[in-house]
């Protein structure tokens, strides 16, 4: 049984459990209706690392042979382009010396995004944003400068808002800022696994890749709430291993970073099990309890899996999975969810309900999504 199916079956029982453990307080969910219909983000991406080897066929069929020769040439060209992109992504970091343009006004830059949105009105036309190459380079440079100066484990002071997977639904991100508070006045912790697809020019794509190499692995809120994208690692023994992990981090394929990007909780697993994703592990509820005790944290917040309700609670409320993209890809009738953490580490779930006919009835039939009768942990 998949985690999502187990969620539908067991969630009502999990949410009504009482936990005498002091500290983090999970409050009832408040719902926020989505302001604009999400633009589809679906698409097909071909992995250049999985290119087939050249095919050898008989010389009898000249047409097939000609087709195979064309395929082999394209395969070699794609492989060559892939190697060039790898070299570009691992090239020198952008610095003030190799950056020629003047700095942009980031206040004005952000205001452009807010001006094309209007909270609470679904009929507003959402215009696409257009950027110059100089704007791309400025934003990437400033972000890379900040990321490079931070540890791999970032310490966050509450209050803040924790966001899960958005999957490129940019309109929902801007709507979130409008409703819950605009940065930098409101602090946001993103557990999204950021990727960059080379469709905006190889040079800009490479700049994004080098910037992303400096992103932190996880965040620690008030020393008690640990946030990451995927999950836990059997190699993780203390928080200093995360805090002191060297950066930049380039394409980890094993170890703590890889596990924390790919791992998933699974109540049917006793301890650890190799993940069916092909990378990382699945881990059971006893692992969650042990890790919280060993690291001295009271709650783990992660993303990485879609939840129709927007969130999924495990292990006596010691682990929460959140999914923040409502109406995912304009296909799933799901709710998005974020977590608001206040100064006392009280946690409130905020639901972003997509505008659709009978959406409340649809989701209620799935799992009674935003039930305000959920008990608080006192």
From Swiss-Prot:
GO terms for cellular component: cytoplasm; nucleus. Residues 1-11 have a biased composition (Basic residues). Coiled coil: none annotated. PANTHER family: SERINE/THREONINE PROTEIN PHOSPHATASE, SERINE_THREONINE-PROTEIN PHOSPHATASE. Residues 1-23 are annotated as: Disordered. This is Uncharacterized protein C30A5.4. InterPro entries: Calcineurin-like_PHP_ApaH, Metallo-depent_PP-like, PP1_catalytic_subunit, Ser/Thr-sp_prot-phosphatase. GO terms for molecular function: protein serine/threonine phosphatase activity.
């Amino acid at each position: 049984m998949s985690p999502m199916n187990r969620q539908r079956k067991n969630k009502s029982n999990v949410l009504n459990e009482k936990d005498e453990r002091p500290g983090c307080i999970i409050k009832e969910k408040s719902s926020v209706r989505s302001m604009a219909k999400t633009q589809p983000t679906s698409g097909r991406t071909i992995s250049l690392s999985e290119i087939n080897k050249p095919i050898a066929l008989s010389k009898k069929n000249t047409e097939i042979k000609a087709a195979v020769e064309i395929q082999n040439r394209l395969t070699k060209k794609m492989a060559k382009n892939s190697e060039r992109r790898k070299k570009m992504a691992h090239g020198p970091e952008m610095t003030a010396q190799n950056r020629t343009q003047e700095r942009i006004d980031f206040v004005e830059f952000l205001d452009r995004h807010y001006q094309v949105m209007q909270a609470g009105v679904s009929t507003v036309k959402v215009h696409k944003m257009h950027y110059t190459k100089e704007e791309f380079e400025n934003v990437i440079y400033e972000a890379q400068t900040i990321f490079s100066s931070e540890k791999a484990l970032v310490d966050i002071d509450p209050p803040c808002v924790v966001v899960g997977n958005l999957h490129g639904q940019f309109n929902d991100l801007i709507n979130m800022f409008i409703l819950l508070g605009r940065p930098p006045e409101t602090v946001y912790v993103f557990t999204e696994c950021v990727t960059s697809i080379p469709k905006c020019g190889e040079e800009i794509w490479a700049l994004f890749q080098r910037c992303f190499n400096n992103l932190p692995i996880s965040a620690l809120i008030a020393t008690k709430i640990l946030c990451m994208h995927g999950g836990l690692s059997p190699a993780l023994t203390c928080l200093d291993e995360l805090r002191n992990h060297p950066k930049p981090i380039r394409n980890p394929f094993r170890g703590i970073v890889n596990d924390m990007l790919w791992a998933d909780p699974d109540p049917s697993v006793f301890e650890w099990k190799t993940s069916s994703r092909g990378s990382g592990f699945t881990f059971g509820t006893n692992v969650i309890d042990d890790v919280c005790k060993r690291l001295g944290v009271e709650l783990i917040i992660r993303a990485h899996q879609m939840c129709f309700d927007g969130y999924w609670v495990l292990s006596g409320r010691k682990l929460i999975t959140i999914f923040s993209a409502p109406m995912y890809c304009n296909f799933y009738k799901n709710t998005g969810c974020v977590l608001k953490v206040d100064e006392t580490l009280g946690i409130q779930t905020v639901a972003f309900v997509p505008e659709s006919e009978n959406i409340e009835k649809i989701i209620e039939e799935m799992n009674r999504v935003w039930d305000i009768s959920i008990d608080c942990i006192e």
